[in-house]
Amino acid sequence: FAEFRLPGFDYPLRVLLTPYTNGQRAKRYMGTEDADEGLRVFLRDHWAGLADKYCDTEGGNLLVAHLFMAREGGELPEEPEDERPINIGGADVVYTSLIPPAMQYAALGHLHRWQTVDTEPCPAVYSGSPLSYSFSEAEQDKYVTLVDLEPGCPARVTKRRLTSGHPLARRRFEGVEVALQWLAEHPDTWVELTVATDTFLTAQEVKSLHAAHDGIVCIIPDVRDASLVNDRVASIHD
C-alpha cells in the first residue's frame, strides 16, 4: 500500500500494489498445494484489510496489479504468444469480484492488448503494451489510458490511441514484384513477409526485397510445388 499527496490536489491518492506472483513460491508461503485458490483467498482478505484501513471516500482509491484477472464465469482474456503464461505454472485466474468495493479503478498489467475485463465493482482494465512485442500483435492498435479520480465518484476512463512507433505487419504476396510494390508504399513498417513462388526464392530476389525495405524481419517463401519442398527435405536427410 502507498499513499500519495500530489501538487494541486486537496485529497490523497491511495494505491494497493500487487506485483506478479510465482505459483511455487505462493504454495510455500501459504502452505497449501492449491496455490490458485489459496492465492485468491489471500488477495481477497489482504486487499479487503488494506481497503478497510486506508481507503475511505475522502481520497482516490486505485488497485495496481500484475495478475491474470477475469470476470468470474466470463470469457478469459487471451494471453499474447510471446508473454510468459501467467496461469500455467504461475498464479491462475484472479476474479474481479475480489476487488474491494472501495476501489475506483483497477490498473492491470500482463496482457498486451487493451481490454476491459469488468466494470464492477470498478473498471478493471489492461492498458496493454505501448508497442507490439511480436507479430502475433500485428495490426493491433495500442493505447494509453487516462483515469480521472475524484473521492466518492466513479472513475472517468479515457483511452488514447498511440500513433508513434513503427507498426508490425504480416503480409503475403503472390510474387516478388507485388511484394516490392507494397514495400515501397509502406517504408515505416516492420514486416513479416510471405512470398508465394513456384520455386524457391533466388538469392537475387531475396537481395532485392531487403534492398527495398529496411524493416523486413523475415522472408518466408511459400513454395507452391510441394514436391520441391519434399525433395529439399529428402536431400537434407540424405
Task: Give the predicted meaning of each segment.
Residues F1-G89:
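Conserved catalytic scaffold of divalent metal-dependent phosphoesterases
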Residues A2-L13, T18, C122-W190:
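Binuclear metal-dependent phosphoesterase catalytic core
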Residues D56-T57, S97-A102, T119, L183-H186, ...:
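Short, conserved loop/helix-junction motifs that constitute active-site signature segments
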Residues N61-L62, Y105, P123-V125, W190, ...:
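Structural motif
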Residues M69-C153:
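Conserved beta-sheet core of the metallophosphoesterase superfamily
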Residues L149-D238:
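Accessory, non-catalytic peripheral segments of nucleic-acid enzymes
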